[in-house]
């Protein structure tokens, strides 16, 4: 055994000597160059610029109510966040943050504290507008009306979770146009995986430039099977939030048009066809409110609405949003297909019953 080992070693040495004689370049060992990195010359990826632009305009909101068991003392009932929208002192928050409040306190990040006036609130969008009377300038949230949120955009959620103090969480826009999360709601939610916890409601969802993208409003605490989902937060798009704010400031409430129908849209390939006509896209009526505007005009369940107020009826939500912008009392044409016949009804728009 030992002799075999010596023989193997000797053969290896002989082969190595031959290779070195034939290929002298093998004698040179080139050292591996290790790149030198001076960390002082590089800037780490950061969203500090966005935070510095937006965070001062995000405030803490405290809902205080009387506690009859504590000698009618005011105690904090709920807490949330809000966003200062302009120098006049108007602040957007969620309605559920200030529900049943006897007093609303707003705390700014610079240490100033104000008692806020409730300008108005809207149940369908879960939005409320507050006003503070501040001397001196106020930080306001940057808004770029030309900016449209897109899936994949980096976003930061700013708020006061669990009253820990202002906190920033980061994620992306996971989806846009989410509907059906609130059965009576009118929101087209932005979905994000940025953490939105208790106390973040009413805070700001901003992009990497610090521009307002939405108002944080809810997250899923538990699914139907008891699991706690992660990365499911939702925000109301800033376009809708600012529109509701303007209406609340102007009227003290949101006045919406209403024609009293419910329906679902159908794709052209599945639509009814009239004799010699191309497929028709529209909204199938599945509910007509008794004595509502549509019922009084003659519209029935199973009618196929193809246009409302001279605009094609493509999406049920979009059509209802268009009707909501029409002043109550206006008369609008609604075109439907019924039994392969096209009918036009004149519908008098009423005010949505839950506008107050």
From Swiss-Prot:
Active site: 96 (charge relay system), 126 (charge relay system), 201 (charge relay system)
Gene knockout outcome: Loss of heat shock but not acid stress response of sigma-E regulon. 10-fold decreased survival in acidified murine macrophages.
EC number: 3.4.21.107
Reaction catalysed by this enzyme: Acts on substrates that are at least partially unfolded. The cleavage site P1 residue is normally between a pair of hydrophobic residues, such as Val-|-Val
Any one GO molecular-function label of the UniProt entry: serine-type endopeptidase activity
Keywords, alphabetical: Cell inner membrane, Cell membrane, Hydrolase, Membrane, Protease, Serine protease, Transmembrane, Transmembrane helix, Virulence
Superkingdom as given in the UniProt entry: Bacteria
Primary location: membrane
Membrane topology category: Single-pass membrane protein
Nucleotide-binding as UniProt keyword: no
Disulfide cysteine pairs (residue numbers): none
PDZ domain residues: 256-341
Single biological process term from Gene Ontology: response to temperature stimulus
Function: A site-1 protease (S1P) that cleaves the peptide bond between 'Val-148' and 'Ser-149' in RseA. When heat shock or other environmental stresses disrupt protein folding in the periplasm, DegS senses the accumulation of unassembled outer membrane porins (OMP) and then initiates RseA (anti sigma-E factor) degradation by cleaving its periplasmic domain, making it a substrate for subsequent cleavage by RseP. This cascade ultimately leads to the sigma-E-driven expression of a variety of factors dealing with folding stress in the periplasm and OMP assembly.
Free-text comment on this protein's domains from its UniProt entry: Deletion of the PDZ domain eliminates the heat shock response of the sigma-E regulon, but not the acid stress response.
Family according to the record: Belongs to the peptidase S1C family.
Protein name: Serine endoprotease DegS
């Amino acid at each position: 055994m030992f002799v075999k080992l010596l023989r193997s070693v000797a053969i290896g040495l002989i082969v190595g000597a031959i290779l070195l004689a034939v290929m002298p370049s093998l004698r040179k060992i080139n050292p591996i160059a290790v790149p030198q990195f001076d960390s002082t010359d590089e800037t780490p990826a950061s969203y500090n610029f966005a935070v510095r632009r937006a965070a001062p305009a995000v405030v803490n909101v405290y809902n205080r109510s009387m506690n009859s068991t504590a000698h009618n003392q005011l105690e904090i009932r709920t807490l949330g966040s809000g966003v200062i929208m302009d120098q006049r002192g108007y602040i957007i928050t969620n309605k559920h943050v200030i529900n049943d409040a006897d007093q609303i306190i707003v705390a700014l990040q610079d240490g100033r504290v104000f008692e806020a006036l409730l300008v108005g609130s809207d149940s369908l969008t879960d939005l409320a507008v507050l006003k503070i009377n501040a001397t001196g300038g106020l930080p306001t949230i940057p808004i770029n009306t030309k900016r449209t949120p897109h899936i994949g955009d980096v976003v930061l959620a700013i708020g006061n979770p669990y009253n820990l103090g202002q906190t920033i969480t980061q994620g992306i826009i996971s989806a846009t146009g989410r509907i059906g999360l609130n059965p009576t709601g009118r929101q087209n939610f932005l979905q994000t995986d940025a953490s939105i916890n208790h106390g973040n409601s009413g805070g700001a969802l901003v992009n990497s430039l610090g521009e307002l993208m939405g108002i944080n409003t809810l997250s899923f605490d538990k699914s139907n099977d008891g699991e706690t989902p992660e990365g499911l937060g939702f925000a109301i798009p800033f376009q809708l939030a600012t529109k509701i704010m303007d209406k609340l400031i102007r009227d003290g409430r949101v006045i919406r048009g209403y024609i009293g129908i419910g329906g679902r849209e159908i794709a052209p390939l599945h639509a009814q066809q009239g004799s010699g006509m191309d497929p028709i896209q529209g909204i199938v009526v599945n509910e007509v409110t008794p004595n509502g505007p549509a019922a009084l005009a003659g519209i029935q369940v199973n009618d196929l609405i193809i246009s409302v107020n001279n605009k094609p009826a493509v999406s049920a939500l979009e059509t209802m949003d268009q009707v909501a912008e029409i002043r109550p009392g206006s008369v609008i044409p609604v075109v439907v297909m019924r039994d392969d016949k096209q009918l036009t009804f004149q519908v008098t728009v009423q005010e949505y019953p839950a506008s107050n």
